[in-house]
A protein has these predicted regions:
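Gly/Ser/Thr-rich active-site loops/lids in small-molecule metabolic enzymes
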Residues: 26-34, 84-100, 131-138, 187
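Glycine-rich phosphate-binding loop
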Residues: 58-103, 114
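Phosphate-binding glycine-rich loops and their immediate beta-loop-alpha structural context
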Residues: 1-70
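Structural motif
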Residues: 7-10, 65-67, 108-112, 174-175, ...
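Fold-independent oxyanion-binding glycine-rich loops
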Residues: 11-15, 27, 48, 70-73, ...
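Anionic-ligand-binding alpha/beta catalytic cores of soluble enzymes and soluble regulatory domains
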Residues: 78, 96, 101-147
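C-terminal terminal segments
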Residues: 142-210
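Solvent-exposed alpha-helices and their adjacent loops that cap or buttress functional pockets
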Residues: 2-5, 61-62, 93-94, 102-105, ...
Length: 210
């Protein structure tokens, strides 16, 4: 059986995305390229201001298999009112990416990513990649290497919850970057792997090829 490509709609939110600002919706650009590189379709990739009515209209009008809304997952007055949605997932025990949310309506998936670039990057490389892997190959998870925590030099005790950490892997060792703050965009630029810590003695290492 030949599978049809998944169809995505990307909605970036934020009133900072205007012609008068130098801020660009790079999360949406990255996700758009990631989806296409994995041989699926982006039907629409739009950027809208912080407007609840406009966002609801775009969500309700979506005919794509998967709609990803980026930004507006915080608790300020301009952020999304999630009482309008019947959420299946309302946050993750995870850093970065804790504000992630999801609901399903009429067999279509709607996901909310935080606007923070590091969070969006991790969720794209783990959740979107996992969905594509399940759809393409009927596999329940993406490939990873299992690493003993004692073989990696990093103070994992400082982590308060399950975490994806940016790192660099070469032939000899695995280096976890010291500054794992979600505002540190250098991690995205220099990392070639994500290391998942789930409070056990085994780490999962996911290679980043994008």
């Amino acid at each position: 059986k030949i599978l049809q490509p998944l169809k995505f709609k990307i909605i970036s939110t934020g009133s900072e995305f205007t012609k008068d600002h130098f801020i660009l919706p790079t999360n949406g650009y990255y996700l758009n390229n990631f989806i296409k590189k994995n041989n699926h379709i982006v039907e629409k990739n739009i950027h809208i201001k912080d407007d609840q009515k406009l966002l609801l209209k775009e969500i309700n009008n979506s005919k794509s298999d998967i709609t990803v809304i980026i930004g507006g997952t915080g608790k300020s007055k301009d952020d999304i009112n999630f009482e309008n949605f019947n959420l299946i997932i309302d946050g993750l025990d995870l850093k970065p990416g804790r504000p992630f949310k999801l609901f399903i309506k009429k067999n279509k998936i709607y996901m909310f990513f935080p606007g923070n670039p590091c969070s969006s990057f991790v969720l794209t490389n783990i959740i979107i990649k996992s969905l594509i892997e399940i759809y393409n190959n009927r596999k329940s998870q993406i490939k990873y290497d299992l690493i003993d925590i004692n073989n990696v030099k990093f103070n994992f005790k400082i982590l308060k919850r399950k975490s994806f950490l940016f790192g660099l892997r070469d032939q000899k060792s695995i280096k976890v970057f010291n500054n794992q703050e979600s505002s540190n965009l250098k991690n995205i630029l220099y990392a070639n792997c994500l290391i998942y810590y789930d409070r056990t003695n085994k780490l999962r290492l996911y290679q980043i090829n994008d």
